[in-house]
């Protein structure tokens, strides 16, 4: 009853699922070999399979290509032999086209409707046991990825050795997989296990596609980590502006993170000083789902491989780092209800001497009678300027066939519900320093709000 006990404490139990492949020694490889991408002949005369039989079942032999053992080549297939009939198949390893094959895996063939339904049933089974499912490497099952990797267009070499032999025309490809698999997953889960939250790990700049077109509930937002780490601030600000121009609700579906098990640790990427805490402040105060990596708060530097059963470095938690989280970050997390929604979210350009300073992130939000304004300078340079009018965002107007989208913008004074009257003042507290400020409401209404920030400085105004 672990799931029930967690739910009583406000925690949802999540499962990680790999829908794209199985292990090369899985029960499906033994009992349902037709579900995999395969061929009857060996794709290369240099491949040999004389090593140990890796199958757990005596009915079937499974052989890794010999050059993996000598680390002198990396075959795209392994060999499966039916020991009763002699039937021999060469099943492809998983391969995302960016590196070597994953040589302990077997790639499921998603052009096979039987394979798609088998994976679908497994997903539904997991959903009945876990209220959250995280899909590993979900982007490789988008149709354009299946096309690029496994069934290229005629005349194209393809990204994986020997797959050009299995080229399909557009018409043939669409006939075999008319719908996006993930769209079908979202619809089936909504119908059969409706309280399940689906979370996709999707890279290759496909995050927007997964939420806009495929309807995925949450999607990893790798741009947050990568662009802020590299201080590609204009790029990330543009991505936020483009998102709210299309549909601000999409911001809520992004999972923002500073590291994950496949990446370097947060300490390695962002350090332990102001830049780390500035980006972490963005992570917990923007709409979307903030995700902390294992050991991030403690400042651990070891990157754990998936085969690790324990940590190999004897690391001690950095108490100073933990204390700063308690002071700067955790109180903001208790106010997530102020930051989590987008109905009142406004994103601002910071203007200085007639130009926009792209290094400063500035936005406001509110919930009920609680208001917030967040500033962060993601550059080791002094920066200052004014915010007054928000960037444009989309609003759906009307209903049914009459519904259309309008672009709107609000001022900072509207965002904070201020009035331009001489006898009105606004009092607010800066969270990091604990200092209180008082400003004339009329000044903010007429001129906007001024901000001056040192390199990597962040300020959060609340109360």
Regions found by a protein language model. Give the residues of each.
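Alpha-amylase-like alpha-glycosidases and glucanotransferases acting on alpha-linked glucans and related
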Residues: 1-11, 23-332, 341, 357, ...
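Flexible, glycine/threonine-enriched loop-and-boundary segments that flank and lead into catalytic domains
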Residues: 236-242, 342-368, 430-446
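Active/binding-pocket-proximal capping segment
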Residues: 300, 390-395, 423, 431-432
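C-terminal beta-strand-rich structural cap/linker in extracellular carbohydrate-active enzymes
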Residues: 444-463
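Trp/Gly-enriched beta-strand surface patches
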Residues: 402-446
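Carbohydrate-binding surface patches
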Residues: 352-415, 462
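Single, function-defining residue in the core of a domain
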Residues: 13, 17
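Substrate-binding cleft and catalytic face of glycoside hydrolase catalytic domains
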Residues: 18-22
